[in-house]
A protein has these predicted regions:
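Acidic catalytic loop of the alpha/beta-hydrolase fold
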Residues: 230-234
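Catalytic active-site module of serine/aspartate enzymes centered on a nucleophile-bearing elbow/loop
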Residues: 248-286
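Active-site loop/oxyanion-hole signature of alpha/beta-hydrolase fold enzymes
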Residues: 43, 52-96, 271
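Alpha/beta-hydrolase
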Residues: 138, 144-214, 221
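Conserved hydrolase catalytic core segment
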Residues: 87-129
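Conserved HGGG/HGGXW glycine-rich cap/lid loop of the alpha/beta-hydrolase fold
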Residues: 5-64
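Flexible "cap/lid" loop of the alpha/beta hydrolase fold
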Residues: 115-153
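Short beta-strand/loop motif that positions the catalytic acidic residue
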Residues: 219, 225-227
Length: 286
């Protein structure tokens, strides 16, 4: 359904029973992400929760009125909360969506019941480590002009964004088979919805000053921090920093995953989430 939030139409799906605790999940990849990713990850929780997934402003099938800033995306999450009539919500996000989940918990502390983070970073230092990891890997030959344009927000159009994303997909998984990696990357890229304006905004305007470390000790909600052991772009060290800074956080490392433990170790990931949610709900209602 289309819902107007803060003057911008968002493509929204609501799963689960009315009256259940609400979880709002933000997708990753500003400009390359859409609601399909959090729907697959958090949708199974709709037997217990009211799960809300959506295409962020400027992403997927949503309208694209700028700015595509972290503050605006967090405000849109709160607009969804108001639209749902929920006093408090659980907020979740993976990768870039984790940035927005943390921004929301910082800006709207009284509205957050709990937070689930997956393979994300508290600041922009993960990009430096990603460059180092890219230089030291042997899966793909890096075209550094394309690589730099992607991570510096210099993408020309949606087709350029799709092509540049497809080139680096093989870096994201724990397991790698050179016989199938390129075809799998092409299939994954073909499933995407591309909005280069939002992508460029992320890396031209948002990331250069992104640093939540000073604010994270003030996050009061219980937080689950998850990460894949071989994540090249938001590595274990980033997750460890988040878990160390948020007072009521616990860290779970998935040993057989890269950037996507929610798919690479799906059963374990679902079990870890449910255990956390049951603890939160029990704590809240005790």
């Amino acid at each position: 359904m289309n819902v107007t939030i803060n003057g911008n139409e968002l493509n929204v799906e609501v799963l689960g029973p009315e009256g259940a605790p609400v979880l709002i999940a933000h997708h990753g990849g500003g400009g390359i992400g859409s609601l399909g990713e959090p729907k697959a990850t958090f949708g199974p929780l709709a037997d217990e929760l009211r799960v809300v997934v959506f295409d962020a402003r400027g992403c997927g099938r949503s309208e694209g009125k700028p700015p595509f800033s972290h503050a605006q995306w967090a405000a849109d999450v709160d607009g969804l909360r108001e639209w749902l009539g929920a006093e408090q919500v659980m907020v979740a996000g993976g990768s870039y969506g984790g940035f927005i989940a943390m921004e929301y918990a910082i800006a709207y502390p009284d509205r957050v019941r709990a937070m689930i983070l997956r393979d994300t970073s508290p600041d922009n230092s993960n990009l430096e480590r990603a460059y180092e990891n890219a230089r030291n890997q042997d899966r793909i030959e890096i075209n550094w002009d394309n690589f730099n344009r992607y991570w510096q927000g210099q993408i020309r159009d949606n087709e350029d964004l799709k092509a540049r994303w497809q080139e680096i997909i093989p870096l994201y998984s724990h397991d790698y088979d050179p016989a199938t990696a390129l075809s799998q990357a092409a299939e994954r890229a073909d499933r995407g919805l591309y909005r280069y304006e939002a992508h460029n905004w992320c890396f031209q305007h948002n990331m250069p000053s992104f640093d939540l470390k000073p604010q994270l000790p003030g996050v009061r909600c219980p937080t689950l921090v998850t990460v894949g052991r071989t994540d090249w772009i938001t590595p274990v060290s980033s997750a460890e920093t988040i878990a160390a800074l948020i007072p009521d956080a616990r860290l779970v490392i998935f040993e057989k995953s890269g950037h996507s433990p929610q798919t690479e170790e799906r059963d374990k990931f679902q079990a870890v989430m449910r255990e956390f949610i049951h603890e939160v709900l029990g704590r809240t209602t005790a």
